[in-house]
């Protein structure tokens, strides 16, 4: 809808009442009035209703409840239409107010469009800072890697060559530091950036036109807390930058101390020689320790082999003992059998004065004679005791 069509229209009460009276009822109600000249009762009657007729009185058919309800709705529809017509002028009065607010909002939106340009400049500066920081970190990582490689070379190269290279590297490193910008200049530049941002914001505030309407002034007042939040965020960023600068200063100081220590190293070659000698001793001790660790499993294997040999020898010795015991048992059994046979033979009793020649019993073939002491124990004691 255009602005010309949505202008508010106010009517006097007299005209509005005449319009209400002249509103035609719907077609359904007109037909009902033509059919029923007499007013119908409000509640629907279930019983038969008779209409007075002059000549031919006839009973009127029963009207169901469902036909009564649409008639009541037909009477309510014109009232609803009138209520809607009264609401339309009020809505038309509200709509122009909204249309008046639209140009004001457009002006405020145009003012906001100018702010992203300053934000883009600020973002570009921040991106440059992050890139510089990344480059600085990359340089630090390269220096650390170079130091590690340098230490590895120190262990491998002789002392004289190492000292010469160390002096050359120190000279190169000092030249690089002299060529690089000092950290104090970087600090000054970073401190100037927030001041430049404040000046830029002041210029933007001056360039903005003065508010012509109170509604624009209210819109700006609503924007002020948002701008304050942005300023707080910028202040936090500045604080973080200051902390980062402090860390950078500490790192530069540590680097200076490291350089001083490196400069003092050539003045103390004896200490370096002692340190290298200690390192070589430690390496030798580690090699000896590793050699011992390698020898231990070999010694363990030899010890196990010896134990296995001893076990095998013990098994052989036990087998021999078992064989000897078996032979000894067999010999004793044979001797017992011989003694039993001798006891069964008649014994000659010698007379006094006669000497009896005692001949040792000859064992059968394949048997071993017992020692003399055992034979004497087994001999019969003469003379026999008389009971």
UniProtKB/Swiss-Prot annotation:
Name assigned to this protein: Involucrin
Function noted in UniProt: Part of the insoluble cornified cell envelope (CE) of stratified squamous epithelia.
Compartment(s): Cytoplasm
InterPro entries per the UniProt record, alphabetical: Involucrin2 (IPR009733), Involucrin_CS (IPR019743), Involucrin_N (IPR019571)
Biased composition (Low complexity): 62-71
Domain of life: Eukaryota
Any Pfam family matching the protein: Involucrin2
Ranges where the record places region Disordered: 1-319, 347-387
Tissue: Keratinocytes of epidermis and other stratified squamous epithelia.
Taxonomic source organism: Cephalopachus bancanus (Western tarsier)
Stretches with biased composition (Basic and acidic residues): 85-96, 104-115, 147-179, 231-245
Entry's Gene Ontology BP terms: keratinization
Oligomer status and interactors: Directly or indirectly cross-linked to cornifelin (CNFN).
Protein family according to the UniProt entry: Belongs to the involucrin family.
Cellular-component GO terms for this entry: cornified envelope; cytoplasm
Post-translational modification: Substrate of transglutaminase. Specific glutamines or lysines are cross-linked to keratins, desmoplakin and to inter involucrin molecules.
Secretion signal span: none
Comp. bias (Polar residues): 28-37
Keywords on record: Cytoplasm, Keratinization, Repeat
